[in-house]
């Protein structure tokens, strides 16, 4: 049995593909850098699309400066999107920075740091996992 997707999910996937092509081929702005669309959330009435993006920033670029430059292109991107998709209403596009990758890396680093601190403290006290398991037997 195949999975059923709602109309908003199908439209969201289509918008993600089309927006990626538009940003790659039609938006020419050196301030933006390399953009990846990680997700698109569409409102139930298909009037609004919240586009989550990440950036590969080069040099002095920051995600905030890239996002500000990208937001200047919201109207032209919506117009290009309207030419590509066959919907009665072209959704209003809102770009939002997706920090889940950055937060995930930060959390991973924190966990690694805690594990390394714990290992260092065990070595300083003269106990390791092997000596603990031998003492328990």
Swiss-Prot record:
GO terms for MF: ribosomal small subunit binding
GO CC annotation, single: cytosol
Keywords: Cytoplasm, Ribosome biogenesis
Homology family: Belongs to the RbfA family.
GO biological process: maturation of SSU-rRNA
HAMAP family xrefs: RbfA
Domain of life: Bacteria
Segments of skewed composition (Basic and acidic residues): 116-137
Region entry Disordered, spans: 113-137
Organism expressing this protein natively: Vibrio atlanticus (strain LGP32)
Protein role: One of several proteins that assist in the late maturation steps of the functional core of the 30S ribosomal subunit. Associates with free 30S ribosomal subunits (but not with 30S subunits that are part of 70S ribosomes or polysomes). Required for efficient processing of 16S rRNA. May interact with the 5'-terminal helix region of 16S rRNA.
Protein name: Ribosome-binding factor A
Subunit structure comment from the entry: Monomer. Binds 30S ribosomal subunits, but not 50S ribosomal subunits or 70S ribosomes.
UniProt gene name: rbfA
């Amino acid at each position: 049995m195949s999975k059923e997707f709602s109309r908003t999910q199908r439209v969201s996937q289509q918008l993600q593909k089309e927006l990626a092509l538009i940003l790659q081929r039609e938006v020419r702005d050196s301030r933006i850098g390399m953009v990846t669309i990680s997700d698109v959330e569409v409102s139930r009435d298909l009037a609004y699309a919240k586009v989550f993006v990440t950036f590969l920033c080069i040099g002095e670029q920051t995600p905030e400066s890239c996002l500000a430059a990208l937001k200047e292109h919201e109207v032209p991107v919506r117009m290009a999107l309207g030419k590509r998709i066959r919907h009665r209403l072209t959704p209003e596009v809102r770009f939002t920075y997706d920090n889940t990758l950055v937060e995930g890396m930060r959390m991973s680093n924190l966990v690694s740091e805690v594990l390394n601190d714990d290992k260092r403290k065990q070595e300083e006290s003269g106990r390791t996992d092997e000596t603990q398991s031998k003492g328990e037997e």
